[in-house]
């Protein structure tokens, strides 16, 4: 990110100030990566989010295996209205257990599973190799490691796309390898920041 400050302010360690702001590429229009992902599961909300889903598990689509591979757990970017609407809509598509088409680590077991029926546009700061997420699993060059999104944020529903038209695992892998941080040096391993 880029640090922006007022001209007359001085830096004070361990102190937050509205005079010093960090500007991240995913907050600027046209910068940052955007993904079209499928919500395949959810986690019950707590506190302010009681009665709706507080976070969702999203997946990319692998064309070779015809499976949905988890790439992020997301809980940010939603308005209160979004949370109500999405919970109500996805409740119509609940399934009893995780689909055999879903490649998800046991550590990400959801409270509720859904049929693959929607596509959401998601912005993310970066991608990293992950032992928890399964995006492009088997293609990363490391056994048991997939690709996960860092700091994912909900943007909107993509009504113009079917789930099998979501961002593919190959696209996720290409975006991962085209990051400046990966071209130069690796991001910290397992630095999945789900934003919740």
Where are these regions (language model features)?
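Catalytic cores of nucleic-acid ligases and guanylyltransferases
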Residues: 1-196
């Amino acid at each position: 990110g880029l640090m922006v400050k007022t001209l007359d302010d001085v830096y004070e360690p361990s102190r937050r100030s509205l005079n010093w702001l960090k500007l991240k590429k995913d907050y600027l229009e046209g910068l940052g990566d955007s993904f079209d992902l499928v919500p395949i599961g959810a986690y019950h909300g707590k506190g302010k989010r009681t009665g709706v889903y507080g976070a969702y598990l999203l997946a990319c689509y692998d064309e070779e295996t015809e499976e949905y591979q988890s790439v992020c757990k997301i809980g940010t970017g939603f308005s209160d209205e979004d949370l109500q609407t999405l919970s109500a809509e996805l409740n119509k598509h609940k399934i009893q257990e995780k689909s055999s088409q879903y490649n998800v680590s046991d550590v990400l077991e959801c409270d509720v599973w859904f049929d693959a029926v929607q596509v959401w546009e998601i912005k993310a700061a970066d991608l990293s190799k992950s032992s928890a997420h399964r995006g492009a699993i088997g293609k990363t060059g490391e056994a048991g490691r997939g690709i996960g999104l860092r700091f994912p944020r909900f943007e909107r529903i993509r009504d113009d796309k079917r789930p099998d038209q979501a961002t593919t695992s190959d696209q996720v892998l290409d975006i991962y390898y085209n990051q400046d941080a990966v071209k130069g040096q690796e991001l910290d391993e397992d630095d999945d920041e789900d934003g919740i």
